[in-house]
């Protein structure tokens, strides 16, 4: 379902990579494709069903014989699999889309279930647009489907129209009015058009649903689907209220989220619950002080529990002395190594100008007192890039290093940005490894600025760089020069500290 949000279909290899991540995460069932839709999807379902051993694979099919047969064929190599059939049951869909009455819908559903049972005894049936289906009709078809052998009844909020108490009412009515309801697992499949997919899913659990359908990062048609990582952690954190648990390996959540984001080329919003970059970040001085004293003061989830290493304290003008001391302590400095009052005063000045301050900035303030607006050691004077065939590029850069100017041309590189970075590296000889490159448009149209944010590793330390220009190559070059200056400042700190120790 999540693939419907993408501008381009995923390859078989990409889908398999995601499926293996889901298996490692411990998901019970994964719906891996709609094999009738294309030869590529058939191949994906076939390949994944052969590789996955610890999760049950599932294939989607309409109430059409050919769909069901192809779904069964695609998963025939798997030891155990599920066929998921769907058919609309709301009056609106029956009349305007299917042109059928409810009795005909029931007949189609029963025929399709019997067809699917030829391939597997694990059948799931979705009453499409169930949340807008009259409760009497829904109860009637659910009872007949269970009698036919359907093991999982799915209640989709197909257009994200329902609010939590409505979905809870539907689920409770099924348990009250369908006599054989306990022979089947009740599932819900919620969309996020009104921003209530997760809330609806939790409400359904409280009403008796025991399967939640969703996607990693909530990607999906229109506004998306239930974000699995949010439901999973809600169940874990509020098990005292919900009284249920999952088989998920929670420490795989963050890693899986990042992999899905990367493969699908869908960045995770910084304020995204559970997996956003700000989910465990603290900027307020009061909050930072509280977290340092006891994490539970301002965090209901331990970041380690989802695969993150530690809490993130953003150093901004809102940070207090406690956060500054914490960062200095993390870098191995004792309080008598620096003057906290002077450092904090300089820190606030820098934070007002720079926005976010990093650990190496604190070192520079404490030991060489170098402000961001002072002249930098490295300054980009000129650059040019030439792209040739087969995505290869060469670059030439002129860099001011202190008072000396150096010009260097890179050898053939894999792309223009890499060519620029190689040329800069030939001048500075800093053994850096690029770990993250992010481009964000600032504004609209041809004159929009492009901001490049990069993260590199240098001698086991992380350094950030930012570049802003209308030309992406220039933004990229400026970002790397920013990194080089940050590294240079850190090197100066080390020199000063060594000199102090000699004295």
Curated annotation (Swiss-Prot):
GO cellular-component term (any): cytosol
Alphabetical list of CDD domains matching this protein: DRE_TIM_IPMS (cd07940)
Biological function: Catalyzes the condensation of the acetyl group of acetyl-CoA with 3-methyl-2-oxobutanoate (2-ketoisovalerate) to form 3-carboxy-3-hydroxy-4-methylpentanoate (2-isopropylmalate).
Quote the catalytic activity from the record. 3-methyl-2-oxobutanoate + acetyl-CoA + H2O = (2S)-2-isopropylmalate + CoA + H(+)
What this protein is called in its record is 2-isopropylmalate synthase
Record keywords, A-Z = Amino-acid biosynthesis, Branched-chain amino acid biosynthesis, Cytoplasm, Leucine biosynthesis, Manganese, Metal-binding, Plasmid, Transferase
Which top-rank group of organisms is this from?
Bacteria
Record gene name: leuA
Q: How does the record describe its quaternary structure?
A: Homodimer.
